[in-house]
Amino acid sequence: MALSQSVPFSATELLLASAIFCLVFWVLKGLRPRVPKGLKSPPEPWGWPLLGHVLTLRKNPHLALSRMSQRYGDVLQIRIGSTPVLVLSGLDTIRQALVRQGDDFKGRPDLYSSTLITDGQSLTFSPDSGPVWAARRHLAQNALNTFSIASDPASSYSCYLEEHVSKEAEALISRLQELMAGPGHFDPYNQVVVSVVNVIGAMCFGQHFPESSDEMLSLVKNTHEFVETASSGNPVDFFPILRYLPNPALQRFKAFNQRFLRFLRKTVQEHYQDFDKNSVQDIMGALFKYSKKGPRASGNLIPQEKIVNLVNDIFGAGFDTVTTAISWSLMYLVTKPEIQRKIQKELDTMIGRGRRPRLSDRPQLPYLKAFILETFRHSSFLPFTIPHSTTRDTTLNGFYIPKECCVFVNQWQVNHDPELWEDPSEFWPERFLTTDGTAINKPLSEKVMLFGMGKRRCIGEVLANWEVFLFLAILLQQLEFSVPPGVKVDLTPIYGLTMKHARCEHVQARLRFSIK
């Protein structure tokens, strides 16, 4: 009697529940696309009905999917809920998909989180991949190049980027010295992000950018509200019910995007009031020059109200990626002082202390460049590209891939693939140097994946590389970074669209020589 009272369901109810469960499972299985004769579907590990592999991914999808690839190969399929997701690993396979078959894999999945970014009109996240998208991407690329890496004949600097970074790096050094004279330590991320956002802000908006405003600082110091939800594999994109349940992370994501969009719209509007098409001095001016009023545009013109979508991608990616790269670099340097000393010896030998580093010094500083490459590889702080999708039925490595299939590209796996890298878990910049140590091993450097490949490759890749190089060269020429004895620095990546390290508020900076 006691046993029967402890059972909450009758045998009939349990049988009915099991039948419904099996019915749903087989219905979902029947929805899978038919595979043409002679082809096969990618291998798929066992997953839970209804849930798929979401429990397997957990907090570190890049690690879980890397382990799966070791067993199932470079092309495999998982399910998040009932949605099939193609997972690509291996440099050759990824290059085949994104470069050689780039038109097949250039799409973006229509994810819920993407609809919340600039009202679903983001150039980077939008599922659109047609001629209009291509034209706007080309326009954004040209505007970015013109006012960043192109030469400025009226300046003593080689380009706009060099001018802005040089000035902001000096300002950062001054701020760090003030902090050392006060509390005696600092959180590098909070300091670096201010300088980096001022650089991209100056290039985008010129004198109209509100440097160090409370609104701007509040946004850029809280990017975690964006990256934790925009990351690949977020359940909210695959389980619609989660959008209607209490979800603090999703609410923060929505609020951040709304605040960021308001900030950009206000700044764009203020800039437009003073726009002179005969005197274009920043990225916004270049975009205005190729815009027209009204909801529709033709040829190379775009509607003015769409400009904010382009500048959102340029501005947003321009500060978060570079800030994260520099912050990771400083964390490696304080935990590996011998590497820091090698970089500074190279700077002292090749540049000296009588002038500041410039972008033209890059060929003379191979060890610094190798260190940056190893930081990109080892941290892999962009573990996945933004998800891709197929634009048509296709095949890859003999497997059938249907149209509109969501695709995860595992950059972390490539950067830690033992078939590509000797001792991939070790941080070793020398791996990127030629035998005599005087130059970068170019074929090996091209195996590092951080900015994607093919038609969706990041348009700011060159800018980001140059900016990280110049910031670090100027900082390390003048400062020595360290942490006090006994302070533990946690280098465990925190998963997100861009993976951050745990915040460290105990970093110190000492002047290496008197600044003239």
From Swiss-Prot:
Its main location: endoplasmic reticulum. Disulfide bonds: none annotated. Its cofactor is heme. Heme binds at C458. It catalyses: an organic molecule + reduced [NADPH--hemoprotein reductase] + O2 = an alcohol + oxidized [NADPH--hemoprotein reductase] + H2O + H(+); 17beta-estradiol + reduced [NADPH--hemoprotein reductase] + O2 = 2-hydroxy-17beta-estradiol + oxidized [NADPH--hemoprotein reductase] + H2O + H(+); 17beta-estradiol + reduced [NADPH--hemoprotein reductase] + O2 = 4-hydroxy-17beta-estradiol + oxidized [NADPH--hemoprotein reductase] + H2O + H(+); estrone + reduced [NADPH--hemoprotein reductase] + O2 = 2-hydroxyestrone + oxidized [NADPH--hemoprotein reductase] + H2O + H(+). It comes from the Eukaryota. Interacts with PGRMC1; the interaction requires PGRMC1 homodimerization. PANTHER family: CYTOCHROME P450 1A, STEROID 17-ALPHA-HYDROXYLASE/17,20 LYASE. This is Cytochrome P450 1A2. It comes from Pongo abelii. The gene is CYP1A2.
